[in-house]
Amino acid sequence: MIELHQVSKSFNVNGKTVEAVKNVSITVEKGEIFGVVGYSGAGKSTLVRCINLLERPDAGQVVIDGKNLSTLSSKELRVARRKIGMIFQGYNLLKTATVYDNIAKPLKLEGVPKNEIETRVNKYLSIVGLEDKRNNYPSQLSGGQKQRVAIARALAHEPEILLSDEATSALDPETTEAILQLLLKINAELGITIFLITHELDVIQRICDRVAVMENGHLVEQGTVLDIFTKAKHATTKRFVGSEASFDIPQDLLEKYVATGKLVSLHFIGDEADEPALALVSRKFDVLPSILAGGIDHLKNGTLGKLLVHLKGDEVEYSKAISYLKESGVVVEEVELL
């Protein structure tokens, strides 16, 4: 559906060349929700704008449904872009137009027949839950409602792909969750492929199938959300995951536990979260486990339990216990203090 092949993009800033995106390659399957996460300045926004050629890459290829967008004529590109909707952090609504007209006007400019415009606007206002706001103006809406209008406007062109550029970053947590649930609904019911960028790992965790991590214009790691959370390899990815999974235990207390045993981070994936593997460790081996902290993350396709555990016992028994946990499907990582 979306193929990025060695895409690069640079800008001239005060006489200096700034490489915003450097040789990025990503493939997104039809119907997938794919996320790109990174800190500010990583190149995320530039990358997402390369997909519909709002930013034309200096090098590489952007291929949508087998078509290299860079080789299309202006007319062909306009047609191709109709299948790529986009939502932004800043809504970009017309202040003097009603909700209905904000959705309808782009369709009028596209030459869509009047009766078809009416049908589409009503359909997508219903999908985003704003049927009763059709005659309201943007100033009368909350931030979440404005974003819903922006989503309806993007959907009214009936795209196959929806690009999301930090669409939830200006919203409060409750509204963010509502928008994420709406995106999941759109993906499931309409079959639309979603490509989103964010600096919030929680957004990735809640709705994405796969994720790529960017730093300084480079793609440093990509994989399933589960793999990124449990088997992160790159330092930047580990910082993201580490900040998300932090239990905020005082350093002096952790040092006390390390002095008397081993500290391990355990991840229980899916059904393994319900298995008593840790409870059986003390029965099978001469080690004493103490749970210091824990929690459960709800991913798009399952659950991920996480525990910080102190294991007290000799080295041989400790090794046996760790092997048993791994064989039981638990992801185990020894915690090293700074």
Curated annotation (Swiss-Prot):
Residues 2-241 form the ABC transporter domain. It comes from the Bacteria. It is a peripheral membrane protein. InterPro entries: AAA+_ATPase, ABC_transporter-like_ATP-bd, ABC_transporter-like_CS, ACT-like_dom_sf, MetN_ABC, MetN_ABC_transporter-like, NIL_domain, P-loop_NTPase. Its main location: membrane. It is found in: Cell membrane. Transmembrane segments: none annotated. One of its GO terms (molecular function) is ATP hydrolysis activity. Keywords: Amino-acid transport, ATP-binding, Cell membrane, Membrane, Nucleotide-binding, Translocase, Transport. ATP binds at G38, Y39, S40, G41, A42, G43, K44, S45. It catalyses: L-methionine(out) + ATP + H2O = L-methionine(in) + ADP + phosphate + H(+); D-methionine(out) + ATP + H2O = D-methionine(in) + ADP + phosphate + H(+). PROSITE patterns: ABC_TRANSPORTER_1, ABC_TRANSPORTER_2, METN. Its EC number is 7.4.2.11. GO terms for cellular component: plasma membrane. SMART domains: AAA (SM00382), NIL (SM00930). Part of the ABC transporter complex MetNIQ involved in methionine import. Responsible for energy coupling to the transport system. The complex is composed of two ATP-binding proteins (MetN), two transmembrane proteins (MetI) and a solute-binding protein (MetQ). Belongs to the ABC transporter superfamily. Methionine importer (TC 3.A.1.24) family. This is Methionine import ATP-binding protein MetN 1. It comes from Listeria monocytogenes serovar 1/2a (strain ATCC BAA-679 / EGD-e). The lineage of its organism: Bacteria, Bacillati, Bacillota, Bacilli, Bacillales.
